[in-house]
């Protein structure tokens, strides 16, 4: 028998590619292993799979395996002289059963990261399940997050004129009511550019959830992601709702299932929760998000849900969420495309108790804003890091601007620069491309004040290039790509108080390949 020594899984929703390298070791079963994410480009490395069907165990050393999609089952073709086909259920080969969870890097602050995602905050339950909405495998594709009481609601949405039906519905619903009870999320069909029929599908799906949750239809919000122009598979979704509602729980596993269910081309799921104190009251905030491609400021192609148990008024919570989004999701970019479906919804249950936060200028509001910023920035960075084909996260920090908005504009410009992103992938410490993107951002500044650092390498001072260790700088970029780490670009444009950050990723050959093969 041949034993799998390593397994490379490119876990794109509609394009799962399986390649197994075999050793000559004799084994009837594979050692138990917790599959971990290690440095990769568009691939996830799984050193040893916990379970593998017997059909694969019979393959001989040296066989290369190629994946062919056959509905919900993956046909794996062994590249032998006989070109044998064997069928493998997706659940049997995916690390972490479906896709791994992304590590979330939080900014430093008076909070502690805890398990739980959207169910960490008091009063929330979640579920995620496979409802036959997507073609590839049995990866969950339908999620539901509910609050046991009326939760103060907030939302931000795409600025794309071709807004999807769920975006239009949520905007109207949030305008009509300051509270909500449930958020339904489907993956597989964007329900964008689907006209009146698509909007009616949204209403019927919302009605089904409201009925089985025992809440008013106006208390249910909805998000959709997937292929533009395709309506929700309404019948399959509605049929799945009773089981979905019945599986709701406050467990970490339920939160994780919901985080996976909302993904599309993501290689990793994004989920985070923190615990902190606000005005002496212990509170929790959690969130999930999806996004990998079509990511550009003014939201990025992303869906997100935030839950918290702070007691806060809508007049404070809603502008607070907008501020946090402007400092996070509106500051990430992968490919310059802004989606039709971008949505972030945020619910506050008030279940933690403590005094109600009703003054946005209060110290308690400042503390809540900082915690919310941390959660959303952590999720945003994980989305940028998971950019299609990306080998590293790029973090751009701008200081010395006239105000935060000016700094944010410059940071976005550099993070979005295709030439800068390509140079980083090529491990080229090209200060000229960074300076160019800084200059065309549309923010006036004195070029003689321009300073640029790449990591610890000082590239420019007073608008002039400096001599630096180009080999060392190139090695810095190479190492970041090898370990899927972070490339830091620090830019100073003057002496003002404004500062901001933006996040992106490098631009690889694989980005073009992935999007040439994937129908948007």
UniProtKB/Swiss-Prot annotation:
Pfam family membership, one: ArgJ
InterPro entries registered for this protein in UniProt: Arg_biosynth_ArgJ, ArgJ-like_dom_sf, ArgJ_beta_C
Pathway the protein acts in: Amino-acid biosynthesis; L-arginine biosynthesis; L-ornithine and N-acetyl-L-glutamate from L-glutamate and N(2)-acetyl-L-ornithine (cyclic): step 1/1; Amino-acid biosynthesis; L-arginine biosynthesis; N(2)-acetyl-L-ornithine from L-glutamate: step 1/4
CC terms in the record's Gene Ontology section: chloroplast
Role, per record: Catalyzes two activities which are involved in the cyclic version of arginine biosynthesis: the synthesis of acetylglutamate from glutamate and acetyl-CoA, and of ornithine by transacetylation between acetylornithine and glutamate.
Family as reported in the entry's similarity comment: Belongs to the ArgJ family.
Protein name from the UniProt record: Arginine biosynthesis bifunctional protein ArgJ, chloroplastic
């Amino acid at each position: 028998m041949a034993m799998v020594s390593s397994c490379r899984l490119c876990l794109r929703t509609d394009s799962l590619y399986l390649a197994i390298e075999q050793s000559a070791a004799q084994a009837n079963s594979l050692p138990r292993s917790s599959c971990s994410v290690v440095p990769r480009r568009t691939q996830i490395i799984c050193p040893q799979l916990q379970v593998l069907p017997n059909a694969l165990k019979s393959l001989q050393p040296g066989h290369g395996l190629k994946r062919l999609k056959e509905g919900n089952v993956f046909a794996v073709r062994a590249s032998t002289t006989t070109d044998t086909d064997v069928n493998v259920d997706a659940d049997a080969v995916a690390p972490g059963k479906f896709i791994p969870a992304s590590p979330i890097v939080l900014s430093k602050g008076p909070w502690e990261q805890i398990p739980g995602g959207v169910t960490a905050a008091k009063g929330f339950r979640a579920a995620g399940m496979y409802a036959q909405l997507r073609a590839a495998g049995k990866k969950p594709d339908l999620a539901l997050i509910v609050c046991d009481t009326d939760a103060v609601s907030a939302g931000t949405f795409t600025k794309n004129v071709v807004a999807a039906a769920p975006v239009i519905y949520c905007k109207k619903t949030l305008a009509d009511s300051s509270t909500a009870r449930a958020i339904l999320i489907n993956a597989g069909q964007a329900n964008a550019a689907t006209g009146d029929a698509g909007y009616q599908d949204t209403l019927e799906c919302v009605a089904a959830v409201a009925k089985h949750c025992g809440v008013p239809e106006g208390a249910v919000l909805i998000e959709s992601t997937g292929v533009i122009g395709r309506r929700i598979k309404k019948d399959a979704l509605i049929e799945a709702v009773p089981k979905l509602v019945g599986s709701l729980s406050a467990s970490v596993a339920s939160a994780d299932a919901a985080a996976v269910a909302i993904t599309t081309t993501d290689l990793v799921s994004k989920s985070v929760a923190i615990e902190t104190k606000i005005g002496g009251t212990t509170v929790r905030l959690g969130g999930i998000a999806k996004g990998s491609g079509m990511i550009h400021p003014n939201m990025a192609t992303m869906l997100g849900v935030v839950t918290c148990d702070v007691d806060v008024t809508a007049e404070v919570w809603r502008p607070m969420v907008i501020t946090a989004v402007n400092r996070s999701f509106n500051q990430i970019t992968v490919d310059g495309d802004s989606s039709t479906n971008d949505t972030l919804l945020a619910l506050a249950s008030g279940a933690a108790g403590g005094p109600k936060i009703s003054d946005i200028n209060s110290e308690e509001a400042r503390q809540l804003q900082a915690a919310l910023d941390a959660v959303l920035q952590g999720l945003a960075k994980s989305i940028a890091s998971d950019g299609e084909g990306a080998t590293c996260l790029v973090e751009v920090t701008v200081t010395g601007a006239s105000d935060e908005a000016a700094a944010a504009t410059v940071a976005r410009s550099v993070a979005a620069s295709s030439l800068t992103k390509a140079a980083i992938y090529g491990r080229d410490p090209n200060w000229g491309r960074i300076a160019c993107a800084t200059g065309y951002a549309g923010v006036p500044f004195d070029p003689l004040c321009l300073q640029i650092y790449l990591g610890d390498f000082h590239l420019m001072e007073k608008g002039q290039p400096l001599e630096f260790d180009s080999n060392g700088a190139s090695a810095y970029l190479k190492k970041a790509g090898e370990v899927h780490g972070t490339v830091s670009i620090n830019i100073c444009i003057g002496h003002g108080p404004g500062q901001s950050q933006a996040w992106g990723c490098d631009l690889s050959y694989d980005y073009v390949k992935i999007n040439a093969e994937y129908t948007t």
